[in-house]
């Protein structure tokens, strides 16, 4: 499951390295292992779900100087904002982001301790853990399912996922296992104009103009929720 810690030997090796490339099936981006490696000065590029084809098309082919500029602008907007509102097909989800700082993931990691996805291109923020209420439709893709043929419907109150229905929603049972796993932990906006929706969340959440939310752990980017997943 994305967000679970790697073996201690792997965590130690990450911390001792100068640069770490992480082409894994599940994401290590929001783990203590990645956080501690960054504190030690390691540059880390996480690539969960990366495929050979993704190296030659889509998000990886973007002009990353432009991605970096746009990501910085959207990050500033998130930091300045106090609330976000997602509307789709008559459903509304209100998200409290007051007092939290936006985080850029431009796919450019030149300095010691810089980390993020590759390919990348998103600005994201940790909402207040009890500050999301409403309903939303997901019509792009979902971790554990892939590219959606039909939408998912989610009901959220007090920052927690209360129900999810739709295509293969049973694959998301870990989010309903407890309130910690089901906490809305991230709001993100895609900033990569070359990214393609393909069912692999690594690239899907980077598609320019899309918005995504995540559930679970957010302690690595300004939140307070530590869960079994992200």
Task: Describe each region flagged by the PLM.
Residues 1-149, 157, 165, 178:
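Active-site bordering "gate/hinge" segments
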Residues 36-39, 100-102, 152-155, 170-171, ...:
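Short, solvent-exposed amphipathic alpha-helical segments in soluble enzyme
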Residues 81, 133, 151, 184, ...:
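Short, surface-exposed beta-edge/turn micro-motifs
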Residues 103, 144-146, 169, 192-197, ...:
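Residues in flexible loops and secondary-structure boundaries
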Residues 148-151, 166-177, 201-202, 225-227:
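Composition- and surface-driven signal marking solvent-exposed, interaction-prone regions
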Residues 157-195:
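A beta-strand-loop signature enriched in Asp, Gly, Thr, and Trp
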Residues 181-230:
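Cysteine/selenocysteine-centered motifs that mediate thiol-based redox chemistry or coordinate metal-sulfur cofactors
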